[in-house]
Structure formats: structure tokens, C-alpha cells
Amino acid sequence: MVPQTETRAGAGFKAGVKDYRLTYYTPDYVVKDTDILAAFRMTPQPGVPPEECGAAVAAESSTGTWTTVWTDGLTTLDRYKGRCYDIEPVPGEDNQYIAYVAYPIDLFEEGSVTNLFTSIVGNVFGFKALRALRLEDLRIPPAYVKTFQGPPHGIQVERDKLNKYGRGLLGCTIKPKLGLSAKNYGRAVYECLRGGLDFTKDDENVNSQPFMRWRDRFLFVAEATYKAQSETGEIKGHYLNATAATCEEMLKRAQCAKELGVPIIMHDYLTGGFTANTSLSSYCRDHGLLLHIHRAMHAVIDRQRNHGIHFRVLAKALRLSGGDHLHSGTVVGKLEGEREVTLGFVDLMRDDYIEKDRSRGIYFTQDWCSMGGTMPVASGGIHVWHMPALVEIFGDDACLQFGGGTLGHPWGNAPGAVANRVALEACTQARNEGRDLAREGGDVIRSACKWSPELAAACEVWKEIKFEFETIDKL
């Protein structure tokens, strides 16, 4: 018997429950250039065939429900339904499969990450037939990419605004993250920027708390930024966190930052939500502000290998929604991140065209249609000894963010910034001269210590600090 893969309105309505695979599992389907494609890692419940699970995922994330409904006959279901067109077992895993699902582009509102996610990662993740489900990757077709505006400015425009080329950018998250008064906070910002950093940053927790209201912070930070600029002759910035309880309040804070003339603001895009993020990105584009994005809450969603959403999907979604910077992990620091996987989604953030490469976790070729790139931000447990690896891994188009690795310097904040700037420039020069930083990085840092006492002091403090834990999320 040939499975029924098309819904025919003329066949008449027959009430009851039927297998999803009769309608939504279509292995002969030829993918269209306009289809949105998803790769799901499925763990079926015992006794449930993978074809039924794959079809259920396609159905529940598109047009299907648990029973046959008579209103199916009032539309052309074949035009709108998702289709599970391929299933492959996961090597080395029992009862795990990658299900490939194609969605017609007409299922989604133009320019809306919110609507995209509501369908593809909605109720289907609670489906009883599945023990676990993880969205590994999405292909966003050019026809849908072109409905989004993407980052407010992108990497090249940011460099032009800052007038900084040929090296990575340096940042620092002000610590302690909570508890400082606005004036002391501004003092720390000034010292770090004066010492040689390009940016300082609000921690993701910093909004508008009793110990430091947002307007006071904005004013003292703006003063610190302008003072550091006048003394160094370089353009400086501080990521002022505009995240707030409501979109209206968030945009009010963004407007204040614009009126103060600062170059960049910040948003927590997962806790704030994609609707808020897209609104803020549009405001930044219209008013000349760069937008730094923090990924607070991402590990709740992406860290488990079998269930949730891989960060590469969250990174793609952010590029669509809009952000000039996005935290991406470090590979070498205190936070989770395997090298090849991290470099895979870093390329998805920065590059215009990325080929399918399963060795890096990239399931689909992605064409961004000249949409501006998002600069990856490496932060979390890094210090000067990590600089050679960071320059070798991320290259120039990245922001390397040292919080404790700046403010923990034994001589103070400004010497900590000096140490990081010297280390970055030494490693960049060594790389440009053709030296292998992976092999000679330690020698490069030790050589630079001879003419930078600040770097020498930092190297002595952090020479034994390592974060050697096995990565959970591997290919």
C-alpha cells in the first residue's frame, strides 16, 4: 500500500485519528529554494517509529493537530504543511535520529523571528511521543532573509565609526557586577578606557536597581567615556544596558543614550525577547547607535545535548533580529564551547555565505544575501595568557572581553587594561609576521613582558589559572 502523502479535499471528511506519517512523512519531497529547513535531533519514546516522530514534529510545528478536522478541506493543506523529508540515525547513539523538516515560506510572517520560533520551537517540544527533541540548525532561505533588516550597522560600519582596523577590539565587564554606586562605576569605566581598552560593559544583571539607577549610571559613564577619549585620542564606548521591564522603558533609555552621544548600547536578547530586540535594533539603526547583545539565559536553552535549541540557531536568529555584537563563548575560558562547534556559529554570525559542514555542526548552506555581520564577543574567564589562542581562533573581527582579567590586575584597573592592550598588539604583530601563535604564543607573551611591566605583573598573577573541564555539547 502506498502511503497517503497528499491531502485531497475531494476525498471527503473521515473523522478519527490517523498516523502522522501518512500525511507528513514525505521522503520523495524535493526541497524548494524558498523552504525553511530545520534539522531536529529526536529521541523517540520506546516503541515509536522514527518516521512517526519525524512526521509528528513536522505536523505539530506547522498545520497538524492530534485528530482529523473537517476544516482541512477548506484549505490547500499541501501548500502549507511541513514535511519530514529525511531521517538519519545519529552515529554512536542508540535511538537518536536527525529529522529534516521543510516548511513552506508562507507559514511565517515577514521579518518576525518571534513568529518563526513560535511555530518551529513551540508546542512540539512537549510532545509525548518524544523523549527529547533538539533543534540543531535552520536554513533561512534568501527569500525570507530579505524580509529582515539584520544588524543595525554590521562589522564594517562599526569599524568605520570607531576608526579602528587591523586588530581585534578589547572590552571589559565592570566588576563587581552589582553593588557599585554610579560614580564609582563611572570611575572604573574611565580607568579601563584610559588604560587602552576600546569598550567597557554593563553586566547583563545591571538594569536599574536601588543601588544604581539607570540614568545616574548613564550620566557618569558618558562623562568617563568622553574624558578617556579626550586623553587618548581614540574613540571609546561603554555598553549601556537598555534592557528594561517594558519596551517603552527600554526605548526611553536608548533615547537617553542617543542624546548623551554615546556610540553603543546593550540588550539581553533572550530574557528581553525577540520582539523587544527587533524594536531596539530598528531604533539603533535609525539613530546611529551600535547594539551589543548579551545571551543571558542561553545555557538553559542550548546546553543539553539532547533537548532544546543549539546556540547556532539562536545566533542565526539574533543576526536576523538585529545585533552588532553577540557573546559567543571563548573556547579557552570558563564557559562551555568546543572549538569546531564555536567556530561554526562564529562564521554564521560574521560571514555572508557559509557552506554546509557537518564537521563543524553546520547542517545547511546559509546565504545571508549581503546582510551585515554580527561581531562575536569572547568573554568569560580569559586573561593575558589566553591572548595568543584568542587571536588565533577568532582573528581580527571579534571583541575580546576581559572582566576579571582587567580589574583583577594587582596594580589596578588601568594597568590591567594596559596589559591586555600590549598582549593583543604583540600577538597581532606576531601573527602578521607569520609566527604560529598556537605553538609560539607563550614566547610572544613572555617577550612582550620585557618592555611592559604591567603585562609582566598580569602574567605572574594568572600563570596557574586554567579552566580544564570537558565540553558537554560535542559533535
Curated annotation (Swiss-Prot):
Catalysed reactions, as listed in the record: 2 (2R)-3-phosphoglycerate + 2 H(+) = D-ribulose 1,5-bisphosphate + CO2 + H2O; D-ribulose 1,5-bisphosphate + O2 = 2-phosphoglycolate + (2R)-3-phosphoglycerate + 2 H(+)
Modification after translation (UniProt): The disulfide bond which can form in the large chain dimeric partners within the hexadecamer appears to be associated with oxidative stress and protein turnover.
Gene Ontology MF, one: monooxygenase activity
Modified residues (N6,N6,N6-trimethyllysine): 14
HAMAP family the record matches: RuBisCO_L_type1
Summary of subunit composition and partner proteins: Heterohexadecamer of 8 large chains and 8 small chains; disulfide-linked. The disulfide link is formed within the large subunit homodimers.
Protein name: Ribulose bisphosphate carboxylase large chain
Organism: Tetradesmus obliquus (Green alga)
